[in-house]
């Protein structure tokens, strides 16, 4: 199993989004079983509406297909979604899917990589997601 921990402020931010009616999803290139187990262990079963890890037959990110499928499952338009991530692959996936991309600096990569991959905005703390969401139509 992958060793993962929740970044400081992440749980509070997710709870804040959930309280606003925002639908939350995870899309990972890690195997589905490991992804689902990690998310459940960190946040419980009710935080995310959809959790997808890589399964046989799925295209890997940065292909936008799975981001589109998740948006469809959640009954939201891609243009109304924020795709939040810390890598070039995340920014490429979100852009290809037509989503608003939020690059985060608390992950594995640096500002330069996120800028080079055209993040719409780059943030330093999870709480900043709440302010961004206030100005966007991300809930339905």
Label each PLM-derived region with a short phrase.
Residues 82-124:
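Acidic, Mg2+-coordinating phosphoryl-transfer loop and its flanking beta/alpha structural elements
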Residues 45-60:
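A short, structured active-site edge motif that brings together acidic residues
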Residues 1-26, 32-36, 64:
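Short, acidic loop-to-helix structural element flanking the phosphoryl-transfer center
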Residues 34-37, 69, 93, 113, ...:
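Phosphate- and divalent-cation-binding pockets in alpha/beta enzyme and binding domains
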Residues 19-22, 74-80, 136-138:
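Glycine-rich phosphate-binding loop signature in dinucleotide/nucleotide-binding domains
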Residues 61-91, 102:
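Conserved Lys-Pro-Asp/Glu-containing loop-to-beta segment of HAD-superfamily phosphomonoesterases
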């Amino acid at each position: 199993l992958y060793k993962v921990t929740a970044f400081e402020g992440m749980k509070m931010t997710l709870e804040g989004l959930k309280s606003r009616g925002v639908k939350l999803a995870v899309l990972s290139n890690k195997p589905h079983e490991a992804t689902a187990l990690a998310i459940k262990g960190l946040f419980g079963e009710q935080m995310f509406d959809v959790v997808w890890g890589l399964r046989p037959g799925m295209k890997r990110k940065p292909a936008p297909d799975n981001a589109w499928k998740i948006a469809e499952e959640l009954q939201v338009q891609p243009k109304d979604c924020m795709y939040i991530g810390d890598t070039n692959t995340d920014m490429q996936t979100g852009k290809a899917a037509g989503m608003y991309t939020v690059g985060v600096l608390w992950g594995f990569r640096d500002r330069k990589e996120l800028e080079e991959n055209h993040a719409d905005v780059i943030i330093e703390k999870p709480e900043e997601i709440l302010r961004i969401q206030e100005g966007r139509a991300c809930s339905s």
